[in-house]
Structures are given as C-alpha cells and as structure tokens.
Regions:
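A short, glycine/Asx- and small/polar-enriched loop/turn
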Residues: 64, 164-167
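Exposed loop/turn and edge beta-strand positions of beta-sandwich/beta-sheet ligand-binding modules
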Residues: 5-8, 167, 350, 394
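S-adenosyl-L-methionine
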Residues: 14-18, 55, 68-163, 195-510
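Short, polar/flexible loop-turn hinges at active-site or ligand-entry regions and domain interfaces
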Residues: 33-37, 95-101, 179-184
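Polar, glycine-rich mid-to-C-terminal structural blocks
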Residues: 170-211
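Membrane-helix interfacial "entry" motifs
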Residues: 4, 181-185, 389, 415
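Short hydrophobic/aromatic beta-strand or adjacent loop that forms the aromatic wall/cage
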Residues: 166-171, 353
Length: 510
C-alpha cells in the first residue's frame, strides 16, 4: 500500500471547475503512482473526494489541521479589493479579520495557514513580493515569526509565470526550527520577515527630525488635468494670466528616462483656488469643466465630486515646505536606481515622485551614497524588480550623521568633510548632467552603462563620495553598515523620546 493516498488531501476553491479538476488530478496521480512505484493497492473503486476537495470560500470555512499546506492564494492589492470583490464581501472579510486591513488579499491565507498547520508540519505559499513589505508583511510574515514560526526557505522575488504581470515571493515555513536556511537558492544563516538574510531594519523608528521634509507628490484624480504643450502655448498667448495655473508636471518616468529628468507633460493646477477664482482662468477652467468634471461626478467620494476642479491630494504640507526654495531634490517613487536629482522650483511633482524639500548638496550627498542605498534596499518595498522609495520607511527612519555619538568618544564630521561631501556631490551632479546632455540619455541608462564599471568616472565619483560619507558617520570598512545605522536610529529615537534634539536631514554644526 502507498503511504499517501488522495483521501489525505484537502482543499477549497470558489471555482467549481477548479474543484472538479483537482479531484480528477488526484485520481490520475494515484494511478500514475501505482504504475511507477509498483504499489499493490487497487486502482478501483475510485476514491470519493467530495468531502475532501470542496467548493467553498477558504476565508470563511474551517480548515482541516494539516501536516503540510501548499497553495497559490489570489493576488489582489488591498486598494483594489473593493473594486474587484465588492463592498459587501470586503466588509465580511474585515469582520472575520478585524485587525487585518489594507493588505494584499493573499495575506489572509498566510494567517490561516499559520493557525492551522500541525506543530511538526510545513507550509509553502506563493504571494506577490509585496508580502514582505509594509502592512502586508506585518499581517503575514511578522505574524508567522511572532507566533513561533520559522521561515526556512524562500525566494524573495521572481517574475510570475502566470497572467498577472507581477513579481512573486515563495515562502516556506514551519514551527520547528530548521538546521539550514535557503534564500534565493543560497544557504544563509537566517531569513527574516522581510525575506532578507541580514539584519532586519523594519523595526527602525520614525525620527521626528526627518519629518515634514520628504513628501509624495500631488494626486490629481483625473487624467484630463494633464494637457499638451500646444494647448499651454495657445492659452498663454490668449491670456498670459493662464501661465499661473499651467505647470510642468514631473512624473516618475521623466526623472528616470529624460535628459536631466525634465518633464514633458503639462498640467492645470488650481491648487486651493475657490470655484469663483478658478473660473477667472477661462480656458483652463473650461477644459477642466468639460473633461474632468464628468468623470469626477461619478466618483464615490463626496469631496472629490464637489471640488471637481481641485486635485484629489493637493499636498499642502509639501507646497509649504517648498515655498521659497529655488530648487529641491526628487526621486522616482519606483525606479531601478532610486537616485535623487535636483529639480527647479517650477516643476510640480506628481505622486510618482518623492520630494525632498531641501537644497543642500551635503544632504543630497548622504542620500546618494552607498550607505543610504543599503538602507533603502533593506527598507524599501517592491512590486516588480524595481525599488519603491517611500518617504516614511526609507527617509523618515534614516539616521543622518550626528554632532556626537559613540559614547565616551564624541564624534562629529568636520566642517571640512561636510564641505567635501557638498563639493563631491556637485561634481557628480555636473558630471551626470554633462554626460546625459552629451549622450542624450536619461539617468537610468547612464547608471545602467557605467555604475558597475570600475574604470568609469561615474563609478570613481561614487567611490570617492562613499569614502567621505563613511568619514562623516565615523564608520570603518569592517563595520556592518546596516547594523550601525539601525543602532544609530534607535539611539536617536530614544534621544527624541527624552526631549533631546537630534540632527535630521541637515549638516551637523560643531
């Protein structure tokens, strides 16, 4: 007799065809096993699997306690659940899982698997790679590790072979602590809940010294706020007052692909103007009334419907922080390299931009260094192969060099080092600008070509900048940079808690 039979398998699906297909597959598998393994059990009668593989919703049906759980839960971002599943169903889910909201739909399966696995069993699930990030991570992989689970094998990210154009993570875990850990097919010493082999920086604290400096750009809510350059020229020619509400609109793609990141789109921006004042800009206002308002009238949000000429998210805090600056620094929210670049004050950043309301090239140098890159890679979220830079997890938690640290041995970057970082960053910026204009490339192509080439000027400038930033922190080559940064983050958070002043995104003063 075989040690495993179809009657030991259980499963659920809301698709009746998938349920029947699973039953047939198990029946065929039994026949194949008998033939290949020369088993003595009888092929007939067929096993009745109607009580094993059932057409039910796994989120609302008790699971059988199992020794092994495998599955491919549905991929659906938390923000899309209501649109795809309906309000009534989503409210039922929230009622069933009152402490788990705004997460990827597959997160609920991870929690149920953790709750229903045998103490000696194992689980293996596939999910979008956002499962190791933000709220989804807290609801799933943190839940597993906080409840005595051990992630023993995982693929952190790989393209999904199915229809969904996403990257996925594969996670295997158990209650029993493993002897070996394998991450991305390599043996590692451990796997944390961020699906990384090194120190987990997700516990880093928000530093108040970094707050109100870094922002996500505006969200118009209406594609027809965007207009052509031809329209802009015509409207300004007819009334130059219109120039006040017509702005170059910075998207993530222009920052990555265009020379110097220059936007190639224009947008109408009435900001906080009331209806009467907005209508004084006749041609732009008529355009919004004719093309944006009909779509806004269908919007579920009352405020969005009533204030149809205004953006869904105007970002007043960002605008206030940018007021008076001649330029600022900006990075695409999703990109391969996550490089901050200078932007003139008259670019209006969209929501695919993360904006730093500062002009000091010393700060840009710190954020351009490998030290910050390591932090971003450890903190950032991804959906495909690119890096998602967030103003909260990547920037507000990041500890900048301080006037004094390391206990009995006060350390501070000298004025000379601070100025050298500024100068080197300006040199790097000027070099990149010259190369982009010469080659007609965007910054992504420039970095793709030269960042990893030791003989390139780009590589050499980054190496020189990294050495200066290491000096600013007082780090040594043998230091575990992430560990040191996390330690510094905790130190600064504790100082802030005690009412002490710490240095955020600015040059320390001796």
């Amino acid at each position: 007799m075989g040690l495993v039979t179809p009657l030991q398998f259980y499963g659920m699906d809301i698709n009746p065809f998938a349920v029947e297909l699973a039953k047939v597959t198990l029946t065929i598998a039994k026949k194949v096993a008998i033939d290949k393994l020369n088993l003595t059990e009888q092929e007939l009668p067929l096993d009745t699997l109607d009580n094993n593989i059932v057409c039910k919703d796994a989120l609302f049906t008790p699971w059988v306690k199992a020794e092994a759980i495998i599955g491919n839960p549905p991929f659906l971002g938390g923000k899309h659940m209501r649109l795809n599943l309906g309000d009534e169903y989503v409210e039922q889910v929230f009622k069933q899982f009152p402490n788990v909201k705004d997460v990827d739909f597959c997160s609920y399966w991870f929690r149920l698997a953790q709750d229903n696995i045998d103490k000696t069993g194992r689980v293996g699930l596939v999910a979008t790679n956002s499962i190791s990030q933000g709220k989804s991570r807290k609801a799933t992989l943190d839940y597993i590790t906080d409840n005595k689970g051990h992630i023993h094998e995982a693929i952190s990210t790989q393209p999904w072979s199915g229809e969904a154009k996403v990257h996925v993570s594969i996670v295997n875990w158990s209650y029993e602590q493993p002897q070996q850990y394998f991450l991305d097919d390599k043996e590692v010493s451990l796997i944390n809940s961020s699906l990384q082999p090194h120190i987990d920086v997700s516990s880093a604290k928000t530093l108040q010294a970094n707050c109100n400096k870094c922002f996500q750009g505006v969200i118009p809510v209406g594609k027809d706020f965007i207009v052509t350059e031809k329209q802009v020229k015509e409207w300004i020619t007819k009334n130059n007052k219109n120039e006040q509400v017509l702005k170059l609109f910075s998207m993530g793609s222009n920052l990555a692909k265009n020379i110097n990141g220059k936007p190639n789109r224009w947008i109408i921006d009435f900001n906080n103007l009331n209806l009467e004042d907005a209508s004084d800009y006749k041609l732009p206002f008529e355009h919004i009334k004719n093309f944006v308002k009909p779509e806004r009238d269908k919007n579920r949000d009352k405020k969005t419907r009533e204030y149809w000429w205004k953006y869904g998210a105007k970002r007043p805090a960002m605008r206030k922080a940018l007021a008076g600056l001649s330029s600022y620094f900006v990075v695409p929210r999703v990109s391969k390299w996550a490089i901050f670049v200078p932007a003139p004050f008259n670019w209006l950043p969209g929501d695919l931009n993360v904006v730093l309301a500062l002009e000091d090239y010393y700060v840009l140098g710190i954020l351009t260094s490998n030290i910050h890159r390591l932090w971003v890679q450890a903190q950032s979220s991804t959906l495909k192969g690119d890096t998602r830079y967030t103003n909260t997890t990547c920037f507000e938690t990041f500890p900048f060099p301080q006037p004094s640290r390391k206990g009995e041995q006060p350390f501070a970057p000298t004025d000379n080092v601070i100025q050298q970082i500024r100068n080197k960053t300006i040199e790097l910026h000027e070099y990149r600008t010259q190369q982009m204009e010469k080659k007609q490339w965007g910054i992504t192509q420039l970095y793709n070509e030269y960042f990893h080439e030791p003989a390139s000027k780009l590589y050499q400038l980054h190496q020189e900048l990294d050495k200066l930033v290491m000096q600013a922190y007082g780090f040594q080559a043998e230091d575990d940079i992430l560990s040191e940064l996390l330690k510094l983050n905790f130190e600064l958070a504790e100082k802030e808690k005690q009412g002490e002043k710490v240095i955020g995104a600015e040059a320390p003063k001796r």
